């Protein structure tokens, strides 16, 4: 098979042939991050004075990974992603893309760097007077690609995202999920190395969200594109991301592998995002002590609680439990109410420690 040119999508058949030859898609690289944010800050000037949206942000995003940025509304996550591709110019610090500081680049260099970063949004931003094929061709037209080559590239991408039979449809004739697939194809038109996703699934129903996340994961794995996901939903992070940064009040609260953050969040905002409304719901149970037990795959297939009750001869009240698929393994959490008697509570905690089951006291 002929090697794809500049505007050709890396289709699964081509990737398979590369793998047979020992050539692998771009993988996460610890030593050479594709994006570095160093002391990044952003202020907006208002009539009432400056407002700080970001302060002293330091992050490294590796080649070929799916990196999540999560936070509550107003935390600064959307401003952060817009600073990465210079839709917003940082007030301080620097953005380093493939070893080069964007702030000192000449306009042409900066434009080429930005073409290497595709972006999709919550509201799709499709051109209503253009059909699906024309929407995907649009960035290629701006880049000076010939109409024939742009059409060929757009058709390849629309086939990749599963819309080959909807190329002549207009945005008003599409569902929300189909519109986002068009937006993804358009963002990939210039063959980017990074795909920025700003709340890309927030306006979609759960089933459509799942299909879009599966598509993003497919693009990452088969084409080696680094994907950066901005969201306020922990379920999105757990479904697709390798690592995550939690942003709170304009600062990075913590960064780590998704499974590590789930197992042992170090920040209050991390615990809040993982537990969701569970902590608030449990306030109705009075002042009793509660612990959160974390199951990491091994324990999720064993009767840990049943064995604990039999061994300690102490009944417990299960207040919440759920399981999740994180990084390809079953993980879960359970919040139980400890007995009021300190001796009984101590026996339960000692049993869990002996059994090497992770837990933390949540109140």
Model-predicted segments: where are they?
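ABC ATPase NBD coupling module
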Residues: 48-51, 102-118, 147-148, 261-265
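Helix-to-loop junction immediately C-terminal to a conserved catalytic motif
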Residues: 85
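Conserved ABC ATPase "signature" region
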Residues: 100-101, 137, 141, 148-165
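Short coil-to-helix segment of the ABC ATPase nucleotide-binding domain corresponding to the Q-loop/switch region
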Residues: 130-137
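Conserved signature/switch motifs of ABC ATPase nucleotide-binding domains
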Residues: 169-172, 190, 197
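ABC ATPase "signature
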Residues: 255-256, 264
């Amino acid at each position: 098979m002929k090697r794809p040119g500049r505007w050709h999508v890396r289709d699964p058949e081509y990737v398979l042939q590369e793998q047979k030859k020992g050539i692998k898609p771009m993988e996460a690289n610890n030593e050479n991050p594709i994006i570095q944010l160093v002391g990044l800050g952003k202020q907006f000037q208002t009539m009432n004075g400056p407002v700080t949206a970001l302060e002293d942000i330091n992050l490294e995003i590796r080649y070929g990974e799916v990196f999540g940025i999560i936070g509550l509304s107003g935390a600064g996550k959307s401003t952060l992603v817009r600073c990465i591709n210079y839709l917003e110019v940082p007030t301080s610090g620097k953005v380093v893309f493939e070893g080069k500081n964007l702030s000192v680049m000449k306009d042409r260099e900066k434009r080429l760097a930005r073409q290497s970063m595709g972006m999709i949004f919550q509201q799709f931003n499709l051109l209503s007077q253009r059909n699906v094929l024309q929407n995907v061709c649009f960035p290629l037209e701006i880049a000076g690609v010939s109409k024939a080559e742009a059409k060929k590239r757009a058709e390849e991408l629309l086939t990749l995202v599963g819309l080959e039979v909807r190329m002549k449809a207009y945005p008003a004739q599409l569902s929300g999920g189909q519109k986002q697939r068009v937006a993804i194809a358009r963002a990939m038109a210039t063959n980017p190395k990074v795909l920025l996703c700003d709340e890309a699934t927030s306006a979609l129903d759960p089933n459509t969200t799942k299909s879009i996340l599966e598509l993003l994961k497919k693009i990452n794995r088969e084409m080696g594109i680094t994907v950066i996901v901005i969201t306020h939903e922990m379920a999105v992070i757990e479904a697709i991301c390798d690592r995550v940064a939690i942003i709170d009040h304009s600062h990075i609260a913590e960064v780590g592998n998704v499974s590590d953050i789930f197992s042992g969040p170090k920040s209050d905002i991390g615990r809040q995002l993982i537990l969701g409304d569970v902590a608030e719901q449990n306030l109705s149970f009075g002042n009793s002590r509660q612990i959160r037990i974390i199951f990491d795959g091994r324990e999720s297939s064993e009767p840990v609680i049943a064995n604990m009750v039999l061994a300690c001869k102490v009944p417990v009240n299960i207040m919440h439990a759920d399981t999740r698929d994180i990084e390809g393994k079953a993980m879960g959490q359970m919040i139980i109410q400890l007995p009021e008697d300190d001796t009984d509570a101590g026996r339960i905690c000692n049993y869990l420690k002996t059994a090497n089951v992770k837990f933390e006291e949540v109140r």
